[in-house]
Amino acid sequence: MFGDRQRPMVLVLGLGESGLAIARWCARHGCRLRIADTRETPPNLAALTAAGIDAEFVGGAFSPALIDGGIELVALSPGLSPLAEDLAPLVAAARERGIPVWGELEFFAQALTTLGANGYAPKVIAITGTNGKTTTTSLAGLLCERAGKTVAVAGNISPAMLDKLTEAIDAAALPDVWVLELSSFQLDTAHTFAPDAATILNITQDHLDWHGGFAAYAAAKGRIFGPRTVRVLNRDDAEVMKFAPPAAAADAPRAITFGLNEPAADGDYGLLRENGIAWLVEAVDRDAADAPATPSRRRKQEAANPPDIALKRLMPADALRIRGLHNAANALAAYALARAIDLPAAPLLHGLREYRGEPHRVEVIATLDGVDYVDDSKGTNVGATVAALDGLAQRAVLIAGGDGKGQDFEPLAAPVARWCRAVMLIGRDAPALREALADTGVPLADHATLESAVRAAGALAQPGDAVLLSPACASLDMFRNYAHRADVFRSAVEDIALEKGTTL
């Protein structure tokens, strides 16, 4: 369970959901534990005690002294940046002493390796990206279920991977398929993780403060791929396509692409627009033999004789219940992942039609006097808001602002100029947003509260428009979390509905 170490003494840094899961897992397998948190009484300390875990707890600032006294393994919670001023010296000291630094994902990967020695061989699907992870993960899990597999969905989406694995072991019900949503934080401390199929949906600026820069952030995303992982890549994203294997490499892993244009290579996915209808399609080689070639042989064959590609219609895009072109891309990614582990197409297509989406992700909560009120409170970065505006493809009054996390807001200018009737600015970084959008020609208005912004947006919107809450920012400057921000938005829309003599 712990590589070449038997019941090591483990230092767990951070007692959030993931840290608590690691502590439970290590205690279950006989490890001695020291747990440290910068908070003197973290909320999960009571849960640790209730679980009967015998651990030394140290509250307060981190220091290298925490690894003294026989620590053999350091477990790092995903919320803690290894670059943080109080943590970097500790991590450096651990590495100097040859002490491994793992995150929960590495513990999970090591556990699967151990279970594999006893015959457990599940398929593992992994999803990362700046935006769309939760939607694609939930959808991929549903598709695998519709194909008749037992499925466990875990990771960044919650529950923690180790908690889900413990539950499955205790129930003697290990799943056929694991579908994991993984953040850059979780991937940063993974070393041996090697899923069967994985996707990077997109890479745009986010968490730059945590990683120290965009290059490090993108590199962390790339750690999702093992040596033989089928790579499902967004061909519309140049940063993602940097992870495409070299075409000439004989031992390169298989790669599949998806995008919002017509696919041109056998096995890729995309959109075909024909007679006013957008279709989800798969590119197929008309001349392909019945017996599939290996990826390396297929590349050699295609280099010598370019395939004659036909586009196989899968379903109309408007048959999806999730709105927006970005969600069509998410659907293609989920379908490609399921097909990459050899699941049959027919039940997957039924699942695509069935999926209703996740809350706070371009969710239409009301239509009042012809105006859609759209909750995209989970849109906590610039890329998410760009995707929401382009995906809805309708005139909108945008509500944006909050804690910008050091992002560059300039990429918002073009979609705002194209789609927005006006922008309501809220939160701490409203001035930075105003500066980035100043030359768009779109009216900008500052509001002290979200309620005020919603009311003003509703007054400006015309029938056929959307009032879109897609802040491009984190919420903690004004709200408890993004769900609280969404609740305030919904409440404000409910007030407008009541004034119009209706309810949501």
Curated annotation (Swiss-Prot):
Gene Ontology cellular component annotations, sorted alphabetically: cytoplasm
Its job: Cell wall formation. Catalyzes the addition of glutamate to the nucleotide precursor UDP-N-acetylmuramoyl-L-alanine (UMA).
One Pfam entry name: Mur_ligase_M
Gene this chain is encoded by: murD
Enzyme Commission number(s) of this protein: 6.3.2.9
NCBIfam families: murD
Species of origin: Burkholderia thailandensis (strain ATCC 700388 / DSM 13276 / CCUG 48851 / CIP 106301 / E264)
Binding positions (ATP): 129-135
Name of this protein: UDP-N-acetylmuramoylalanine--D-glutamate ligase
Pathway terms, separated by semicolons: Cell wall biogenesis; peptidoglycan biosynthesis
Keyword Ligase in annotation: yes
Record flagged with keyword Ligase: yes
Superkingdom of origin: Bacteria
Keywords attached to this entry: ATP-binding, Cell cycle, Cell division, Cell shape, Cell wall biogenesis/degradation, Cytoplasm, Ligase, Nucleotide-binding, Peptidoglycan synthesis
Gene3D superfamilies: Mur ligase, C-terminal domain, Mur-like, catalytic domain, NAD(P)-binding Rossmann-like Domain
Annotated localization: Cytoplasm
GO biological process: cell division; cell wall organization; peptidoglycan biosynthetic process; regulation of cell shape
GO molecular function, one term: UDP-N-acetylmuramoylalanine-D-glutamate ligase activity
Family: Belongs to the MurCDEF family.
Catalytic activity as recorded in UniProt: UDP-N-acetyl-alpha-D-muramoyl-L-alanine + D-glutamate + ATP = UDP-N-acetyl-alpha-D-muramoyl-L-alanyl-D-glutamate + ADP + phosphate + H(+)
Enzyme class: ligase
